[in-house]
Regions:
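Class I S-adenosyl-L-methionine
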Residues: 12, 46, 50, 81-88, ...
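Flavin (FAD/FMN) cofactor-binding and adjacent substrate-gating region
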Residues: 17-23, 52-59, 66-132, 157
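Conserved beta-strand scaffold positions in the cores of enzyme catalytic domains, especially
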Residues: 10, 61, 95-97, 144
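Helical element adjacent to the flavin cofactor pocket in flavoenzyme catalytic cores
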Residues: 109-174, 178
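A non-catalytic, amphipathic alpha-helix used as a structural packing/dimerization or gating element
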Residues: 29, 33-47, 82, 132
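Glycine-rich, N-terminal phosphate-binding loop of Rossmann-like dinucleotide-binding domains
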Residues: 15, 179-180
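Glycine-rich nucleotide phosphate-binding loop and flanking beta-alpha elements
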Residues: 70, 182-183
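Glycine-rich active-site loop/strand segments that organize a redox cofactor
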Residues: 2, 6-37
Length: 183
């Protein structure tokens, strides 16, 4: 449920139009379980690292609609109360979603008819996030190896032996294998 560390630093869990699209192919339970995981994941990240180390800013997330998006815009606005009710249960925030059309001129947009805000979203500095996470790992003796090609992992007595494609091997008490969306 993550994203690349090279993303734009969005701390988000779903716009109304995204959730409406997802509801066409998934159950309500599946969608709101996923939103809850995203919300709790962001809260946990903020707890572990701290807002200052993340450079977290609760600016909100915006969804803009042009005149060509009228049907989608109408559907999103019709479902505001429904989504606010569901997100209140998850986030504890009363009005996660709201109309932000009065900010269109302030933001300097043209050809935008309507705009929604998601008050639960924000931004993070992913570089600072990774720096803080790596520091936490190093402080407890965790070594992270990026960009290595593992050819084999096997048990060797009370250790795991990890073989790399360059002929190098290491022994470790524990191994965590993680991949991102590009692996």
């Amino acid at each position: 449920y993550g994203a690349s560390t090279r993303n734009a630093g969005f701390a988000c869990f779903g716009s109304i139009s995204e959730l409406l699209t997802d509801l066409k192919s998934h159950s309500e339970n599946d969608i709101f379980d996923l939103v809850e995981k995203r919300w709790k994941g962001l809260a946990r990240l903020r707890q572990i690292i701290g807002d200052q180390s993340l450079d977290y800013e609760p600016f909100g997330g915006y969804e803009i609609f042009t005149s060509a998006d009228k049907l989608l815009s109408d559907e999103c606005y019709e479902k505001l109360n429904y989504f606010n009710s569901e997100l209140h249960r998850i986030t504890g925030k009363k009005n996660v979603y709201g109309d932000a059309s009065t900010k269109i001129k302030e933001f300097g947009f043209s050809n935008i008819d309507r705009m929604l805000i998601n008050n639960g979203e924000g931004q993070i500095d992913t570089g600072k996030m990774m720096k803080a996470l790596l520091e936490k790992c190093r402080n407890v003796g965790i070594e992270i190896l990026n960009g290595v090609d593992v050819t084999k992992i096997e048990n060797e007595n009370k250790f795991c032996r990890i073989d790399f494609n360059n002929g190098f091997s290491i022994l470790s008490k524990k191994v965590l294998i993680a991949v991102n969306g590009f692996a």
